[in-house]
Amino acid sequence: MYKLVLIRHGESVWNQENRFTGWQDVDLSEKGRAEALKGGKALREKGFSFDVAYTSVLKRAIKTLNFVLDEVDQVWLPVHKDWRLNERHYGALQGLNKAETAARHGEEQVKIWRRSYDTPPPPMEVSDPRHPSHDPRYKNVDAQLLPSNESLKDTVARFLPLWDGTIAPAVKSGKNVLIVAHGNSLRALMQHLEGMTPDEIMGVNMPTGIPMMYELDANLKVLKKEFIGDPDEVKAAIEAVANQGKAK
């Protein structure tokens, strides 16, 4: 039996402002830092330790991982940062307030952009200085692979080669693996592990900063899944994520 722990980064400044964030490299909010520390403490109290960690190249995930590793007293742990664990690219929506966008375009359209499986939001122009092709952290990535927008289906296609080629073999080798990433890159993994349909994954909301543990069999099929935290707090956090795309 293998164990795999997933954590969505703590609340970011743009989560706090209810903005579409995507690949924009915004920092953790004060609440987000507290969430990361609390998540790490919960793991420590349950006796978790890890052999390797994976995260994205965005600071809100990297800093969350650092806080968690500090809490479990494993700041020395090997950490692999990979752009394929980035959040889904929200295209031209990045930076826009979700509630204002819902009021303008309708809640149903925003829900489709946020939660449908294969409908991407409007693309970001390549000439936009925020486009990843202008960001030095992606200078060694094939420009054809850098998105201007993504659906969840696109995010799955981007992430799965990293899972199949690197992370899954680490899990199968018996390593205790920690992944700290983003709502949609983690949903991509959840869909893959649990065999969810597009409709099923559309209804899944990942709370910020709360560790989720999978127990997996020899074929990486899910035996057990549970959040490491107070059940009422987990429920409230999931509902808060679900309500982000609604007009005020």
UniProtKB/Swiss-Prot annotation:
Domain of life: Bacteria
Enzyme Commission number: 5.4.2.11
Binding sites annotated in the UniProt record for substrate: 8-15, 21-22, 60, 87-90, 98, 114-115, 183-184
PROSITE patterns: PG_MUTASE
Record-marked site positions (Transition state stabilizer): H182
Short name of any one Pfam family annotated for the protein: His_Phos_1
UniProt keyword ATP-binding present: no
Family matches, as CDD domains: HP_PGM_like
Record key words, sorted: Gluconeogenesis, Glycolysis, Isomerase
Active site (catalytic residues): H9 (tele-phosphohistidine intermediate), E87 (proton donor/acceptor)
Record field: catalytic activity: (2R)-2-phosphoglycerate = (2R)-3-phosphoglycerate
Quaternary assembly: Homodimer.
Record function comment: Catalyzes the interconversion of 2-phosphoglycerate and 3-phosphoglycerate.
NCBIfam families from the UniProt entry: pgm_1, PRK14115.1
Stated family: Belongs to the phosphoglycerate mutase family. BPG-dependent PGAM subfamily.
Protein name: 2,3-bisphosphoglycerate-dependent phosphoglycerate mutase
Organism: Bdellovibrio bacteriovorus (strain ATCC 15356 / DSM 50701 / NCIMB 9529 / HD100)
